[in-house]
Amino acid sequence: MWNGYDARLVDSDGAQKNGIEKVRAEMAGRGVLLDVARWAGVDFFEDGIAISANDLDECAKSQNVEIKQGDFVIVRTGQMEQRLDAEEWGGYAGGDAPGLAFDTAEWIYNKEIAAICTDTWGCEVRPNETKDAQQPWHWVVIPMIGITMGEIFYLRDLAKDCDEDKVYEFFFCAPPLPITKAVGSPINPMAIK
C-alpha cells in the first residue's frame, strides 16, 4: 500500500490506513483535459491501443497546455462515448480497453500530478502490455507513487467545450464520499470553467 503500509492493513474491516476519507478535502484543484482521441484524429481509440507518455506530451503541446505539479489530468480516449452510442456494454468493465501505457507511470511520477482520470473502466490499457503480470501499471502507480485514479468518466461535453474555446484547463472538484476505511468511492466530478 502507499506510503510503506503493508497491504495486509486492508481486510474485511476496511483500510486501517490510507482510507478514502483521508483525501476528501484534497480532491480539488487545477484540472487539465488531454483529449488524445481528438488529437489522434479519431472518434475513439480501439480496445488494446496503448497511450504512451509521448502521446500525452504531444497532445498537451498541441492543446497549448502545460501539465503542472498537483494537476488533475483527465485523459479522453472516446471509449465511454463509443459504448454509449452503440448501446453496447458487454466487456466494458473488465474487458479489453484502450488506456495508458506502462511508460506513463514514470510520466505520472515525474509530473507529480495529483490524480489521473480516464473515460475507461481501469485507466490502464487492456490487454496489458506484459504477459506475466496482471495490471502492472496499477502495481506501480498505486503503491509506489500513491496516485489517485478516476475511472469511467463521461467526457463528451467537456471535450466539446474545450475544443470550441481551445481552453483545456479548469477548476476540477471530485471529493469522494467520506466512507471510513474505504479504498474507493463514487464521485460526482465537476469541471468549472
Predicted features by range, described:
Residues 1-193:
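Active-/binding-site microenvironments in catalytic and ligand-binding cores
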